[in-house]
Amino acid sequence: MEHYISLFVRAVFVENMALAFFLGMCTFIAISKKVETAIGLGVAVIVVLGITMPVNNLIYANILKDGALAWAGLPEVDLSFLGLLTFIGVIAALVQILEMTLDKYVPSLYNALGVFLPLITVNCAIMGGSLFMVERDYNLAESTVYGIGAGVSWALAIAALAGIREKLKYSDVPAGLQGLGITFITIGLMSLGFMSFSGVQL
């Protein structure tokens, strides 16, 4: 149990998707103007990462990995080169299924997140999570915990940035830095803050 708790904490703080690896920057900057919308997108990212990571793990471990098809009498087949394409397909399919499910059963939540759900398909933080899973050889349970932790890390970062950007509207920012300029500086300072966790061994 300790291993999974440390994996979750490491995913949220030490290896923050947005502020340590700078993944998902396009939506991170574009949707961080209001806290409400940032939290909505953050929750959607948590759900998608929490679902796609274990699904991709099952597909990779049982079909794509070198020797994974031994159960089918094909122990020498290595389909790992199809990993990237498979992960993209799984992410796109699961986002569509999630979108249709929310539309049918939870229309209020769909109306709140509907605009942001398609953006998640092209969020490289989702793909990054699956590639880290393969590189670090996580099992199914570790993939699930890491997926949820990575989603929480991205949601935490975008919510924090949105809060700061809302306050910056009332600040006296120099003309040359208004808009994206001060946003990039803010992200850099937030990233420096999260670097303080880099020495933590879990």
From Swiss-Prot:
Keywords: Cell inner membrane, Cell membrane, Ion transport, Membrane, NAD, Sodium, Sodium transport, Translocase, Transmembrane, Transmembrane helix, Transport, Ubiquinone. One of its GO terms (molecular function) is oxidoreductase activity, acting on NAD(P)H, quinone or similar compound as acceptor. InterPro entries: NqrDE/RnfAE, NqrDE/RnfAE_oxidrdctase, NqrE. Its main location: membrane. This is Na(+)-translocating NADH-quinone reductase subunit E. It is an enzyme of class 7 (translocase). The keyword NAD applies. Belongs to the NqrDE/RnfAE family. Pfam families: Rnf-Nqr. HAMAP family: NqrE. It catalyses: a ubiquinone + n Na(+)(in) + NADH + H(+) = a ubiquinol + n Na(+)(out) + NAD(+). The chain crosses the membrane at residues 11-31, 35-55, 79-99, 114-134, 144-164, 180-200. It is a multi-pass membrane protein. Composed of six subunits; NqrA, NqrB, NqrC, NqrD, NqrE and NqrF. It is found in: Cell inner membrane.
